[in-house]
Amino acid sequence: MTDTKTPTLDRVAGPADLRSMSDTELRNVADELRAEVVEAVSQTGGHLGSSLGVVELSVAIHAVFDTPRDKLVWDVGHQCYPHKILTGRRKQMPTLRQGGGISGFTKRSESEYDPFGAAHSSTSISAALGFTISRDMGQPTGDAVAVIGDGSISAGMAYEAMNNAGHEGRRMFVILNDNEMSIAPPVGAMSSYLSSLSELSRAGPFGGLVAIAEGMEQLAPKPVRDGARRARELVTGLENRGTFFEELGFDYIGPIDGHDMAQLLSVLRGAKARATGPVLIHCCTVKGKGYAPAEGSADKYHGVSKFDVGTGVQAKAKANAPSYTAVFGDALTTLAEEDPSVVAVTAAMPSGTGVDRMAKRFPNRVFDVGIAEQHGVTFAAAMAATGLKPFCAIYSTFLQRGYDQIVHDVALQGLPVRFAIDRAGLVGADGATHAGSFDIGYLGALPGMVVMAAADEAELVHMVATAGAHNDGPIAFRYPRGNGTGVPLPETGRVLEIGKGRMIREGDGEVAILSLGTLLSDCEAAARILEAEGINATIADARFAKPLDMALIANLVQTHKALITVEQGAMAGFGAMVLQSMAAEGLLDLGCKVRTMCLPDRFIDQAAPAEMYRDAGLDTMGIVEQVTRVLGRDLKVVTLNAKRR
């Protein structure tokens, strides 16, 4: 991707090349880098806005610090594309977030410049402190630098880390990338605090750098100048007129213009030269900086599909069915219209989970708690204790962050919190870090928990209604990313009988396939292929991973030679619960062969979801092959491969 449009960037094979450049040349690198990021993401899709906001910061950090010996930790990693280009992965950018390509996040196995993987928020300061302790204990590492956004710093883990870092008092650097914009606008008191800075701190060894920041403010573009003015109000507000960060033991520098290369270099060089303990540098940036369509968009082009660089118009395939997220949001809104006790809780993902649809109709009954899943779960539990009906809508991968609260505050007390688990299963371009692989197992282990999985979007509508009617304890329902199957949607949901599955297709007694979730359509497709080969399979939709429909399972075992379970989850999930329950009931002694199909015992890297499930053996032909193996049939490999294509 090198051409005459990027003469200065072409000279950068790695960060060491930046350190021999003049400040003017570094400015040129940033300008060329920004254009290249836009061009690269236009071809692959990805997290554009956040990456454009840290172009100058990425160049400046690598120019000042001795990476990879100095450890640079990006929080979340949405903003890491400039970093990847600067650290030897420029030629690989066309493979960004593609199967077999480079990750959309930092990843230890990908580069020595990625010392710590990222994707979930608010981990960077903890990791940086760990590297700092390692340095001080004689390990071959230098300074540690954490870059964290104003959304991520709102999470409790960030404060736990800052509290510990302040107590340790060791030399490390935290750069607060303050753009007032994560996926959704940051919420909570800390966001307000960051938005109300009024006076710069001039005490301590960094007084001169603070003065530089203040002097440069008037020269900054209006968005940054306004951000700096807003940010300066952070510093007072405590009785001794120190910042919140200073109270935690950090030296505070800022706010500075995160797009002014001269200012960034001056402050970073000065901080590196003078720091003896933990330092927080507060940078004001503009998400989507330098690309007009991104700067003018409400979400600043946080996550985009492929797009036209000239117009910014994204190429999105026309959907034949609504997304599962949209179906959930609409079903929840309908339920809320009927039942005033229904409320919704989300953790900084109102649009991602679909609860923004309910918020438009009932803004006072939808609560965005910020990046705070632990708090959100307990918050919902207390509302359930008073008779409200909270729907806690959180992605499967992020619900893991609140597991202790699910156990201690919800399940142990038998409180009827409704967990709407979006992005269940494999999710595509975001890869292993965002896969919803484990919720069946970690929720199914809890006494009193009901766990459902929707086979299609119509079933999801019924499960929303079922959750709304369930008051005997916690209940969860899972559904995947992406669009539904196109089945007709009911106007209102039907309350399902707890723990009862359904027969989909009656076979001839050779093999039964018990499906949980949206792989039901693959099971049906597999049955059609098998029928052409003389195998007439029975198919059932379990609907519930817990409690299991033991009457259905017993019937399948007693009337078939083989039973295969299919799920979009990890080991120790649905199949394991079926086997354990069969063992307890003596059903394993009846001679029916039992096989389980689940995700393999490894993390699966990014690719299109269909490719990921094919890799896992959880697609139509994977099911066909499992059936033929268990029955001892010898379908020709040529036939199977032809059907797979």
UniProtKB/Swiss-Prot annotation:
Pfam families named in the record: DXP_synthase_N (PF13292), Transket_pyr (PF02779), Transketolase_C (PF02780)
Chain positions recorded as thiamine diphosphate binding sites: H78, A119, H120, S121, G151, S152, N179, Y291, E373
Gene3D superfamilies in the record: 3.40.50.920, 3.40.50.970
Residues spanning the signal sequence: none
Enzyme class: transferase
GO biological process: 1-deoxy-D-xylulose 5-phosphate biosynthetic process; glyceraldehyde-3-phosphate metabolic process; terpenoid biosynthetic process; thiamine biosynthetic process
Keywords: Isoprene biosynthesis, Magnesium, Metal-binding, Thiamine biosynthesis, Thiamine pyrophosphate, Transferase
Role: Catalyzes the acyloin condensation reaction between C atoms 2 and 3 of pyruvate and glyceraldehyde 3-phosphate to yield 1-deoxy-D-xylulose-5-phosphate (DXP).
Protein name: 1-deoxy-D-xylulose-5-phosphate synthase 1
Lineage: Bacteria, Pseudomonadati, Pseudomonadota, Alphaproteobacteria, Rhodobacterales
